[in-house]
């Protein structure tokens, strides 16, 4: 959701600086007391409401649909509709100077790597300004020191009022005979406060792994034109978990590389673009300059995981996953203003939308069965609502492990069917360092997800569920539930999420932090929140394994 640019030193009202609590009472099984008391960041004004397939901000008067086409690498995009003074609400499009964000056509903004690449760097006289293009927040880094090299170039160091650091290095390149500038940006999480309850944490007596919780960005002048700086790496330097990006000559994303870390092999995502328009009035097809497909290479295996189709006006109309079949997994229709009026989405469901008068909040009608309501009684596996039960009944186990590539029940084939309880019957015990029942959990925006009661956010040393005060506890409890559902396959428990859904569980974890947690905080605090959310996401990607929790059950 891009807004009018705000500087990080914007003056806050005293009401925003007072302690604030999550709206609504916590249901049975929900505990927020396990998180240590820290100075919470100021909350956003207004409310965030789940409206059909998207999220509506009452303060910003903006509605956003967030879609992820490829879970690996968080290859995502967003469609935002914002109210206009004295006119109809209009969809937002990518800035003209950012071809990398406009590759899905009008009304959509690319959010590759979960939107972490959508940042802008501008050099001023004695400062550097980095703008988060999602929230349109400008972060000012003030010059602290500089050193010149005898051969040309040098090093300049900058810092923000919050202690975030940026270093720009310029060196003479003998091969090209030019000065080449790069930059590194570090978002500080100095002295994070550990959770009060560490009873389920096996390394609670060790030092807090601050360096492993610290987000970092690398930058390079990789695009043509005045707006030339691009993020070329994002993640955590201490554990070598940077996602690296390359760009083509037009400044569009070319590849996203993931280095081999832990048990995970190296991966490479390639974004391919159409060179000609093939769509006609009779059939959808390619559109010149738009994304054609996204492929994933792991080892010697390359798969096309997303293929896009457009109409003759260049509007995105459908997305297919060739690995699953030729039929679209997502499809869209638009009204005369370019706003999505019909959506079919694996994660957001099937909906009809209409925008009344000048409002940005749509009227929505579900297509097909309605979703279960939040805080409703779970249906699914036996004894999940039995307070006296401590494990699944013996009759629900088979002999040996389950390697079936499809989840059971069969209609619960998406990670979010369980973790957000989108389908009735998609609830079960979870094998994650013991048997756990599912409970409703509330995120800082008031959104309801499903998780277990265990150890919160697993981090090096004592667990930290509120880094820099941002509350990720519900997202972490939900992620533990997702891993436990996959872990059920190792225990022979007949209710499970299939093993190839790990990246989907991790993707839902990131979305729950980025969209349903970070948006709760005042707009100037969101860039830091999202950066830390990405580090938490990267950590479970390279370190997390559902088998571990199952083996300990």
Feature names for model-found ranges:
Residues 67, 75-81, 123, 141-147, ...:
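Aromatic-rich beta-strand edge motifs centered on tyrosine
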Residues 130, 182-184, 189, 234, ...:
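Beta-strand-dense domains in secreted/periplasmic systems and polymorphic toxin scaffolds
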Residues 145-165:
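A short, surface-exposed interaction/processing loop segment used at functional sites
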Residues 1-29:
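Secretory targeting and sorting signals
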Residues 387, 392-553:
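Extended terminal accessory/targeting regions
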Residues 70-74, 132-138, 161-167, 191-192, ...:
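Glycine-centered tight beta-turn/hairpin loop motif at sheet-sheet or coil-to-beta transitions
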Residues 286-290, 297, 322:
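Extracellular beta-strand-rich, repetitive "passenger/adhesive" scaffolds
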Residues 26-151, 362-365, 370-397:
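Short secondary-structure "cap/edge" segments that initiate or terminate local elements
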């Amino acid at each position: 959701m891009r807004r009018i640019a705000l500087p990080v030193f914007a003056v806050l009202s005293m009401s925003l600086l007072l302690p604030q609590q999550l709206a609504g009472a916590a249901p049975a099984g929900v505990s927020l007391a396990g998180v240590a008391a820290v100075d919470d960041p100021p909350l956003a004004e207004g409310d965030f409401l789940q409206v059909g397939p998207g999220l509506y901000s009452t303060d910003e008067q903006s509605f956003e649909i967030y879609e992820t086409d490829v879970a690996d690498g968080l290859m995502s995009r967003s469609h935002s509709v914002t109210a206009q003074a004295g006119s109809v609400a209009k969809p937002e499009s990518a800035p003209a100077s950012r071809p990398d964000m406009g590759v899905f056509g009008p009304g959509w903004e690319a959010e590759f790597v979960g939107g972490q690449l959508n940042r802008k760097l501008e050099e001023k006289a004695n400062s550097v300004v980095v703008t988060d293009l999602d929230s349109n927040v400008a972060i000012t880094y003030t010059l602290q020191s500089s050193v010149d090299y005898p051969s040309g170039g040098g090093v300049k160091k900058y810092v923000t009022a919050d202690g975030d650091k940026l270093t720009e290095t310029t060196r003479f390149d003998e091969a090209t005979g030019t000065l080449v500038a790069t930059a590194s940006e570090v978002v500080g999480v100095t002295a994070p406060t550990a959770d009060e309850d560490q009873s389920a944490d096996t390394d609670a007596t060790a030092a807090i792994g601050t360096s492993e919780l610290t987000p970092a960005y690398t930058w390079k002048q990789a695009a043509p034109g005045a707006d030339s700086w691009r993020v070329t790496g994002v993640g955590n330097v201490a554990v070598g978990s940077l996602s690296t990006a390359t760009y083509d000559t037009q400044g569009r994303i070319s590849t996203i590389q993931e280095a081999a870390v832990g048990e995970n092999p190296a991966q490479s995502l390639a974004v391919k673009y159409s060179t000609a328009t093939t769509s006609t009035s009779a059939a959808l097809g390619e559109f010149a300059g738009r994304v054609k497909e996204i492929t994933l290479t792991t080892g010697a295996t390359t798969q096309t995981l997303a293929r896009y189709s457009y109409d003759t006006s260049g509007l995105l109309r459908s997305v297919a996953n060739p690995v699953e079949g030729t039929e679209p997994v997502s499809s869209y229709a638009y009204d005369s203003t370019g706003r999505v009026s019909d959506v079919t989405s694996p994660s957001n469901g099937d909906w009809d939308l209409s925008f009344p008068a000048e409002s940005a909040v749509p009227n929505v009608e579900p297509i097909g069965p309605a979703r279960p309501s939040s805080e409703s009684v779970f249906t699914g596996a036996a004894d999940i609502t039995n307070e006296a039960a401590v494990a699944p009944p013996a009759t629900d186990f088979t002999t040996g492990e389950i390697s079936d590539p499809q989840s059971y029940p069969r209609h619960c084939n998406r990670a979010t069917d369980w973790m957000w309880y989108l389908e009735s019957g998609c609830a079960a015990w979870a094998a994650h360092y013991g048997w756990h029942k599912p409970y409703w959990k509330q995120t800082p925006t008031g959104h309801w997800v499903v998780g277990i009661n265990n150890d919160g956010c697993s981090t090096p040393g004592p667990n930290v569920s509120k880094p820099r005060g941002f509350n990720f506890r519900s997202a972490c409890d939900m992620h533990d539930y997702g891993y436990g559902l996959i872990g059920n396959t190792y225990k022979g428990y007949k209710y499970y999420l299939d093993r190839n859904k790990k990246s989907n569980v991790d993707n839902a974890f990131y979305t729950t932090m980025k969209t349903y947690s970070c948006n709760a905080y005042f707009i100037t605090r969101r860039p830091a929140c999202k950066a830390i959310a990405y580090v938490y996401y990267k950590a479970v990607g390279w370190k997390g394994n559902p088998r571990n929790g199952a083996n300990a059950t």
